[in-house]
Amino acid sequence: YALRAEEPDLTDTGEPRIVPMRVAKHFSVVDRDPDPRGMPVLGCDRQQGGVCKEIWVDRAEPQIRYLELEATGGKRVLLPITLANVRGKKGVIEVESITGAQFKNAPTLKSYDQITLAEEDKVVAYYGAGKLYATPDRAEPFL
């Protein structure tokens, strides 16, 4: 694999592309969609691993990319939105790739106002690897 740059992906105007909504102030959650901020985040074992604190958006392709969590113990980590199931009516976010206790070990960022290309790889790899290795029974063959 190739190591990606320790710099953020940029928009055509030279701004960091993926940022929290506290930076991209013109983004908002539409009224008909649940706002995940404040919702507890549950792992595949249904144990709470943290609370959603912020939404990270893509300025170039307007969509949510990550949820910023305060993991158990206070560490701030990102969760790819593609691996999160926001259950608005239940008021929880469910994640099948890792256990509740594993959120606190997710990679951190140098700055919580942007994410570098290398940091994106680390964050996505952490949760993606959990699909195969988060629990002992996932690490063994099915046969």
Task: Go through each PLM region and give its residues.
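Peripheral interaction segments used for macromolecular assembly
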Residues: Y1-L143
